[in-house]
Amino acid sequence: MSHLKLDTLHVQRSPRGSRRSSRSSGRSSACSSGSISPVPIIPIISISHDGDESESESEIETEPARLFQRRMSIKCTNNLAAIIKEGFLLKHTWSFQRWRRRYFRLKRNMLFYAKDEKCDVFDDIDLSDLCYFECGIKNVNHSFQIITPTRSLVLCAESRREMEDWLGSLKTATAPQRPRGDSFLIEQHDILSNHHHWYATSHARPTYCNVCRDALSGVTSHGLSCEVCKCKVHKRCAAKSIANCKWTTLASVGKDIIEQADGSIIMPHQWMEGNLPVSSMCAVCKKTCGSVLRLQDWRCLWCRATVHVACRPQMAVACPIGPAKLSVVPPTSVHSISTDDAWDVASPKGNFSPLLVFVNSKSGDNQGVKFLRRFKQLLNPAQVFDLISTGPSLGLRLFRHFEMFRILVCSGDGSVGWVLSEIDRFNMHKQCQVAVMPLGTGNDLARVLGWGSSCDDDTHLPQILERYESASTKMLDRWSIMVFEKAIPVPKTPKMSISTEQEAMLTGMVTSANHHLRFIVETNDTQTLISSTRNLCDTVDDLVCRISEHHKDDEQLAVKCDILRQKLNMLLDALQEEEIGAHSGDDLIATIRSLIARSIPVTPGSNAYLLNPNISIEKTEKDQINSKERRNSRSLRSSEKEALQCRANSVKRAIYNVVEHSEPGRPKRYQRKLSITPFEALKLPTNASGESTPCTSPLPIIPPINIISPTMETSRLTCISPLPDTRRDSVDENFFNSINLPAPRQFADSRRSSGVPEVIQEIEEGANGETVYRRSRMSLTGGANIDDAGNRLSPCSDGGENTPTERKLDFLRVPIHTGEPIVDPLCDYRPHEVFERNYYMTREMDKDKEKDKEKDKPVEIDIEKDTCVEKEGSMPEEKLVHTCNLQVPGVVVTPNPQNVYSSASITIIDTDAQTTTEQSSSDDLGGEASDVLSAISNEECSVASEIFDKQDAGQTVGDIIQNMDASNFTHIDSPETSDETEAMPGESIMDDISSVLGHDITYALQDNTLTDDTTTLCSEHVGPPKPPRKKSLSALSRTQAHPRRRNSSPPRIARLARMDSDDNPQQFGFENIVFEIDNRCDDQKMREPPRYCSLAQFVEGNDIARQSFKQLMLEQHRGGDNDSEYPEHQQTPTNKGANLLITTSEDELSTQTAIKIEIQDIDATVRNLNSSMKPNTILTTSTSPTKKSGHGQDISVVVRPPTPLRGDSTKPTVSLLPVSSGGAMAVSMTCSGMLGVRAMNASEIRRHSSHAPGLAVREFDKDKDRRHSGFNPNQLTLDPEHARFLSSSPAASRRISCGSLFKKKNKQIATKRSYGLFSVRFFVVAEPDFRLATLALIRPLIPLNEALPNLQTLKGSKSSLFMGSTLFGFDHLASAEKDKEEKGGKDKEKTPTEETNRKLPIINPLVRLPNWPLANGGGFISKCLLANADTLCAAVSPLMDPDETLLAGYHEKCVMNNYFGIGIDAKISLDFHNKREEHPEKCRSRARNYMWYGVLGSKQLLQKTCKNLEQRVQLECDGQRIPLPELQGIVILNIPSFMGGTNFWGSSTKKDDIFLPPSFDDRVLEVVAVFGSVQMAASRLINLQHHRIAQCQSVQINILGDEEIPIQVDGEAWLQPPGMIRILHKNRVQMLCRNRSLELSLKSWQEKQRQHSISIQRDASSTASEHANSTDEVISERECYVLLNFIEAVSSLVKWVKFLIISHPALQHDLYEVACRASEALESIHPQGKLLEGPSLRTKLVEVIDSSRQLYDDACTLLRDRGHSLILREDLETKLSAALANMEMELKKCSVQKCIDGKLRAYFNVLAPNEESDGRRKSRPFWVRLRSGSTAGQQAFKPPLTNTREAPNNWSVNEVVTWLETMQLSEYVDSFLKNDIRGKELLTLGRRDLKDLGVVKVGHVKRILQAIKDLSEN
């Protein structure tokens, strides 16, 4: 074809063509038929196509035979137009029904296809007259057919999503072009256009084409049907059909719009002709309409009404829309689409609650396709959306302008979560209510809401819609899954996986080549070198040959193979030159330098390898090459060795490039082996003596790198778990606490140790201006600590002698001059081997120079303490000789400065001491290097800038620093990243690292008791303030231009009294003992003001934003020193308390005041408070000379929290003690209880850490302290003292704040009393732990009423900072917000909510037992625990709701609606998900899915892949650490249904159950342990409760180690890398629950209305058939019919009563007389066999009714009294019972009324007398009948009621007809009358009999059979 000049070939073939041409055209075309191609039988499609269509169409003589036309075009021609869509599809070929894979390319009005995209010739199809449709109803194989006038193609896509994409593209290609071509307009055009949506189907009865009016072909009437309007057409006629599908908007109604006089629009009928349902009845004449012989009569698409052609003009104009009127959006109400892509809606008159339907077409074995079409038929098609094709966003955007609407999600739980997430995105919670239709597998949410476990039948969809209309509303809690992911290094040994043979072969070749390259570089043996070279050449040749054979057409691969061969030749040349010694390398190096110099950057940047996201920090064979290189015995010159290594490295890279190109799907596998940072290749020699020798670094100084970004990774990645996998199963859980999580610098708060693994340059400037660089190196190889010799260090080391495994101080001092930076132009391009070689050579060359420099530097070395103390200022300022300005990632022991004192237990940093030649005062303590400095490797903190302030005389710092390795997960706050932000007043550097110290301090003040609840530290005794050297932060930053070191050594701290004695009443109140640490800023830190955390701004629903407000620092002038006296006798233990301190200045604008609240538990009284603390004392001690102006006053706030013993009974005391210069005034607002107050120095600003240190008493037994330490006796412990405090992460520490310690404000306390009694006007800013930036800041110029509106924007949780506080009185904010948020009718939830707030978290007390979960709860200990559950489980102080500031670095992974699982359940879900992805055909039905879950669960029973999960995760509920037993999973439930209907929490049957009843609207989570798959299976059958863990409001899970753990949320599973997971309450959404009581009420009411309407219709019809002059005195035709039944019943009763008396002469004879009298009265109304006529008949009937009623009553009385002694014949008993039953029923129809003339007349009720309440009376239980067996004889002879079987058994034909009419099945009356169906025959009717009677509708058959069953049972 290449030599042809024509662009297009036209091949035409007539039916008379030769056989050869037929064969040739058949091979290359889709159809070889002369007419429209028939659709063959495709076995994959569920609804088969009929093969006789072509035969039936060929019989039509009017249709001429079409010519087959095939068009072909060349590649260059069809590339001219724009391509709409292209890709591969399966094309059906007509020979043997095979499928061929073809490449299709769609353009405007043209479709091209060929074998592949590289073909030069394409078949093209003109789409100008196109018809396309789906194949089949369910369309299992995703096939569709394209029909044009000349071609017909059946195509198959891989998924339904792809099929719908192709159909949408075909729609776009054939639709006229529009000015706006975005996807929304295309979807919108699809909705608003009235085009039909065809699918191929078969029909059970003759069906006719709506276009040509001919019958569809074949016996099954196979053809196309519109999925919306059910329009039927031939396949050949589909393109000719007009766009008259169901209306969607007012514009689509067109000319049929009917407008009334007042301007309102009426909804008209939309008629579709022919193909009416079976037994359709005309709405006008009530006769059957429709035909199976032709296309006739009409049906409405909205109200389902059917009419004759002649009756259609008489039909009402307005359409009632139908039974689903409440849910339908009438097209007349949707006027247009506004600019915001939402409908402009005019609500119709009457009730209107539109329903938005989302259907997942893949759910339930493709049942969703049927539901999707059925909903479009019942509702407006624009209300129904397919989640697979359009998603939920389109429907929500269109419904945005509806005030209230309902959403129905027809799918599984995953799709429900998708829709709810979109509702969050559009913020539409208040205007929509969500319902669920269960089409998925588990359907847990649908079960809980009452909608059942499955819904597979779409026939009863109208009735189901009625249920949703009567549903009630409940709130569903939704929970955010916030995830902080830890970057994990690539493991050294790859995990085993199932790989293909080709991959294994390639991997083996690559490994072999690396092995030989290693020997070539390292070996000294000539024979080994030769053999390795030969084997390398053979391996490379084999690799190139094999890859080239499989990729012959790949030009790029061929180029790469040639490059590989060239690299190999260059390596051989280098080896040859090495042997002959002729290679010098000068020309090669010069060439490389010249090439690199062209693109070298001006300033040295970070190494390119650091920017690789796939950097592996594991050592490979290269490390072994480099480690042995310096010991290589081959005497090579450096240039020769460099050339050889470069050649080997080039060969290795070329091999990797070839393999990566041959396997495009797996590029990362080989990149990881290749991407080795220069730091991995370095191993620094260590000094055996422990001496640290500073040296210059040949490595470049790397700028800080943000490791949070997924594209960044540094060499300082730390591994989460320091243990190997083989030891993880038996190690104490506290061992895993040594975790440093990375955080972005812009998000890391200085108050929390974020453990940022950054190479941070910290500058410490001495007095001489010398600059010292400090760096930290942490665990380069997978988290291990490496010393200089490359040895793996232990995670924690004991004090004592120094061993090679002992951890050194992680700082390397490199005294490098910072004058002119030395730039290595090759640093970014040099290979690793060259890099390492230069480094080692430089190090050896500079060793002598460094020793010479050390001789000049005065250093004092203490071998015993392993410390090296530098003398400050002694380093001469001289330039160092630099070879390369590179960084040394080494771990060496730095010389400790003089102000650092180390011992076996503590490390003290004296920040006030000058670094002079004095020795440490703690020489007597044996030492180890402190690790606190490595943990404080923060940009804002240098080693010497961490200062512990103290009093000069009495106040000191104790043992507070130890075991910094065991840092827990820490929270990350958002600081102000701007450099202009100054330090806030009162801030100190110590506060910035308080969380680091707080969680790593083991024993502050050795003999004193501290717990998790301690928030601040204060000393027992404070000496009087002297004229101190201390100044505030602001003063220091301004006044000290040249700061100097202070030389005061730390004295010993005064200890508190021991509180562990038995007679101490406060021994159980130790949680609130307070110690104090005064913090001062470092002098040198003032030169670079630190940046503190300010108010964080957040992006809604996601992470923290890069915004925050800025707090300008106000100047504060200090007039002088304060030498006021300090009375010693007032400092008693009862005076310790909390102070709220205010400092003021002369200028109001510069006045600043800090509020400080400290809490402690002191047994004091109000009298002690009033007697021991005087107001003038406060005045004397806290007034400074700056208060001369009198502005402001000191306010002391004293707060006492509840203790575990007193709990809620102890109420706090709030004392506001304002102080002025003129006098003192104390206003005390006391709720109850008492406190002491200790005055503080006004010049000091004391603050506490936001995270409390988790400390414990050394003497305290760890068994007793198990609750606070998480001690587990089943696990190994590393260090008894070390493990005691490793119990809680920062989230687990309980924070005591003013918000948690104040009770709810009483209503009697006025708001004015809360904050309006003083002249000070507050501006309150909350501290960063809660909502705002600092604890409190008071400015007199900003009134409180101006500040309070700002707090209203803090729409957080209920327990915010000041909510419930009587100090600030912000209760009205919370209450107003709550009232605004909660709606009416929520009073029932009020009490439970308050109760949960008071008691949560509720922790199962059995978890404290060592043998849990084996404790059955029945023993004495368990009963005692349950009895004291409130005391054991109550929190000392309620945990603050996690604020958004602590979520910095987190991102919302997903939202939980149902449940969260980690471990075995998530593993099963993940395996099932993978199975479904691999084999979707095996997971299409619900039964198969349950089977797969069982198989995968049984697999876990054997494999136990999640064993020892408790050692890999840590669980915290509301901040409390939960000790975990041996388990395999943890499940957190929001709803009481788990994985397919299991009540995993268990039902609560005990009255004394401590847990709250589970609910999905109580904002409470249930935490459950999973011990194995057997428990999961047994929980479906047994009510298990021993596995309960807790009920709480927030959960945090810490994932340890370096392995991913399976996690699932609502059935969607994934592998979660190590890090932290926090589950927090997000919002609530309105869900629709089934209301069965309302359904029953509506059903009964509708039944009564239906009966009433039937009676009216009967009266109207009977009146129309009667004479015009008829009156009430004349018996109507209907009444005459009832009268005949009455006469029959009376005659039968008289007959059988007489026969009874004759058979038993002993009975009363008066009954016989009554029977005779009734017989005579009966004869009087029909003398001589004729009924009386006229008004006399009603009068005579009164006597008959009275006599027959008397006869009935007497007979019943007789049988009741004498029945036990009578012995009747069986036939007589049966007939008498039937006669009495019929008589009772007929008497109910009769009524006697007194007329105006005074006469009594009888009337008959034409309705059936049976009441549903009587007819559905339930039988008594079996035991009741058995118990009343003595009266069985009486019961047997009682006259049966009308609800017995005998009553319907004796029905006549007329009664059966009446029964049919009451069921609205009057269309079958004629058939029943014609076949004389009586009651006896009615009770025996079956499905086949009903079909013979003409009842063919499935629904009618079911209704009749169910009604017959009810008659038989009743």
Swiss-Prot record:
<dbReference type="GO" id="GO:0004143">
    <property type="term" value="F:ATP-dependent diacylglycerol kinase activity"/>
</dbReference>
<feature type="domain" description="PH">
    <location>
        <begin position="82"/>
        <end position="175"/>
    </location>
</feature>
<keyword id="KW-0479">Metal-binding</keyword>
<keyword id="KW-0597">Phosphoprotein</keyword>
<dbReference type="Pfam" id="PF00169">
    <property type="entry name" value="PH"/>
</dbReference>
<keyword id="KW-0418">Kinase</keyword>
<dbReference type="GO" id="GO:0005524">
    <property type="term" value="F:ATP binding"/>
</dbReference>
<keyword id="KW-0067">ATP-binding</keyword>
<feature type="compositionally biased region" description="Low complexity">
    <location>
        <begin position="23"/>
        <end position="37"/>
    </location>
</feature>
<dbReference type="InterPro" id="IPR013761">
    <property type="entry name" value="SAM/pointed_sf"/>
</dbReference>
<keyword id="KW-0862">Zinc</keyword>
<feature type="region of interest" description="Disordered">
    <location>
        <begin position="1016"/>
        <end position="1053"/>
    </location>
</feature>
<dbReference type="InterPro" id="IPR001206">
    <property type="entry name" value="Diacylglycerol_kinase_cat_dom"/>
</dbReference>
<feature type="compositionally biased region" description="Polar residues">
    <location>
        <begin position="1175"/>
        <end position="1187"/>
    </location>
</feature>
<dbReference type="GO" id="GO:0005737">
    <property type="term" value="C:cytoplasm"/>
</dbReference>
<dbReference type="Pfam" id="PF00609">
    <property type="entry name" value="DAGK_acc"/>
</dbReference>
<keyword id="KW-0547">Nucleotide-binding</keyword>
<dbReference type="InterPro" id="IPR001849">
    <property type="entry name" value="PH_domain"/>
</dbReference>
<dbReference type="InterPro" id="IPR046349">
    <property type="entry name" value="C1-like_sf"/>
</dbReference>
<feature type="region of interest" description="Disordered">
    <location>
        <begin position="1"/>
        <end position="37"/>
    </location>
</feature>
<dbReference type="Pfam" id="PF00536">
    <property type="entry name" value="SAM_1"/>
</dbReference>
<dbReference type="GO" id="GO:0005886">
    <property type="term" value="C:plasma membrane"/>
</dbReference>
<feature type="region of interest" description="Disordered">
    <location>
        <begin position="1116"/>
        <end position="1135"/>
    </location>
</feature>
<dbReference type="InterPro" id="IPR001660">
    <property type="entry name" value="SAM"/>
</dbReference>
<feature type="domain" description="SAM">
    <location>
        <begin position="1851"/>
        <end position="1914"/>
    </location>
</feature>
<dbReference type="Pfam" id="PF22944">
    <property type="entry name" value="DGKD_4H"/>
</dbReference>
<dbReference type="InterPro" id="IPR011993">
    <property type="entry name" value="PH-like_dom_sf"/>
</dbReference>
<comment type="similarity">
    <text>Belongs to the eukaryotic diacylglycerol kinase family.</text>
</comment>
<protein>
    <recommendedName>
        <fullName>Diacylglycerol kinase eta</fullName>
        <ecNumber>2.7.1.107</ecNumber>
    </recommendedName>
</protein>
<keyword id="KW-0863">Zinc-finger</keyword>
<dbReference type="GO" id="GO:0046486">
    <property type="term" value="P:glycerolipid metabolic process"/>
</dbReference>
<feature type="region of interest" description="Disordered">
    <location>
        <begin position="621"/>
        <end position="642"/>
    </location>
</feature>
<feature type="zinc finger region" description="Phorbol-ester/DAG-type 1">
    <location>
        <begin position="195"/>
        <end position="245"/>
    </location>
</feature>
<dbReference type="InterPro" id="IPR016064">
    <property type="entry name" value="NAD/diacylglycerol_kinase_sf"/>
</dbReference>
<dbReference type="GO" id="GO:0008270">
    <property type="term" value="F:zinc ion binding"/>
</dbReference>
<feature type="region of interest" description="Disordered">
    <location>
        <begin position="1175"/>
        <end position="1216"/>
    </location>
</feature>
<feature type="region of interest" description="Disordered">
    <location>
        <begin position="783"/>
        <end position="805"/>
    </location>
</feature>
<feature type="compositionally biased region" description="Basic and acidic residues">
    <location>
        <begin position="1"/>
        <end position="10"/>
    </location>
</feature>
<dbReference type="InterPro" id="IPR002219">
    <property type="entry name" value="PE/DAG-bd"/>
</dbReference>
<feature type="domain" description="DAGKc">
    <location>
        <begin position="350"/>
        <end position="486"/>
    </location>
</feature>
<dbReference type="InterPro" id="IPR054474">
    <property type="entry name" value="DGKD_4H"/>
</dbReference>
<dbReference type="InterPro" id="IPR000756">
    <property type="entry name" value="Diacylglycerol_kin_accessory"/>
</dbReference>
